[in-house]
Amino acid sequence: MSDKLKQFKWLIVLFLFLLAIPSYFTYNYFRQSSTLKEAFEKNERIEVLHRLMASEKYAPDIRKAGYVVPPDEAIRLDGVIYPLEIEGDLHLKISPPKKDAKDFQLFFITQVNEKQTHVAFILDKNLNLIDSSYSQQNDNGKREIISVSQSEEAYLLKSVQSEIDAFMKKMYQTLYG
């Protein structure tokens, strides 16, 4: 009788252990999802970008919202979504921010002085410009750094900010209805 009771106790312990494993993963999944929603609601753009781009988990949702991400195989290979493309007026290409980053980078091509110009911006969490770089091909076919007027840079920054804000709103709507 005591052996059967001992066996029964071991079965209960084993059952509880096996139940704990999927419970842990389910809890983690929903905790991550709620963390993303909190980041959206607190307007923490860098945290939102990090969580959206950190794996292939949100790639189908990003595609559903109408944005461009690499194929799932490339995301699995790279470990992140790189780049996230917002096909607006500027066709932004956003690099995935690192965890706990204070800034993020984006790239786009535009026309400055009627020449194709490659632009790189580094923005902070409030989408303020930290640094920028502008380059054009010279007559020899080499890229050279150029400077742009303050008004041109302000115009480009405002366009970038509005496209990122529109992306954030659309992604929130797509994910949380």
Tell where the protein language model's regions lie, with residue ranges:
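Short, Lys/Arg-rich N-terminal segment immediately upstream of the first membrane anchor
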Residues: 1-7
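N-terminal export/targeting and maturation segments
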Residues: 22-100
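Short, flexible coil/linker elements and helix-boundary hinge sites characteristic
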Residues: 8, 34, 43, 55-57, ...
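Intrinsically disordered, low-complexity segments enriched in glycine/proline and serine/threonine
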Residues: 7-12, 47, 102, 114
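Hydrophobic membrane-insertion alpha-helices, especially the h-region
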Residues: 10-25
